[in-house]
């Protein structure tokens, strides 16, 4: 069982002006898939705060999988992908590509996602859309291969990608 964190990135959620439904929904999905969700937070759309939370989850807490929800769109304050890429050491472009492909099957607006994913130390970080529906569709599109990716990340070289 791998540890996981869910970070909701929302100015209104942080200020208590909007109820976060995406974060708790992602927590439930992760638990159903066998993850141990050990950390959750709600932070504003502030680049430095996003980076600090991601680094904390990776470097201090040693969490295997970190999901963010929110801040991946076109609004001027949507800077989650940029903050994540500031601290990611090894990009994993196939994950957001798969999420966008699945989203495009549902709506042409799926191409507007700016989600990114990558590895920092031994933590896989995936940025998801802010809506409950889109974040659920996106994570369900990739969670099974992500679990295998974590097996490889934690295997010390003994896991086979072809399996």
Predicted regions and their residues:
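Non-catalytic beta/alpha edge segments that cap or flank active sites
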Residues: 1-163
């Amino acid at each position: 069982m791998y540890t996981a964190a869910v970070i909701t990135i929302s100015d209104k959620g942080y200020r208590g002006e909007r109820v976060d439904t995406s974060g708790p929904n992602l927590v439930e999905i992760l638990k159903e898939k066998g993850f141990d969700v050990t950390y959750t937070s709600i932070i504003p759309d502030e680049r430095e705060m996003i980076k600090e939370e991601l680094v904390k989850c990776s470097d201090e807490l040693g969490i295997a999988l970190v999901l963010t929800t929110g801040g991946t769109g076109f609004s001027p304050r949507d800077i989650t992908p940029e903050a994540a890429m500031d601290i990611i050491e090894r990009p994993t472009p196939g994950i957001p590509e798969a999420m966008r492909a699945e989203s495009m099957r549902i709506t042409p607006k799926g191409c507007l996602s700016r989600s990114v994913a990558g590895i920092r130390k031994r933590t896989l970080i995936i940025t998801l859309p802010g809506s409950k529906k889109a974040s659920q569709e996106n994570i369900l599109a990739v969670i099974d291969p992500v679990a295998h990716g974590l097996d490889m990340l934690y295997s010390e070289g003994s896991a086979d990608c072809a399996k």
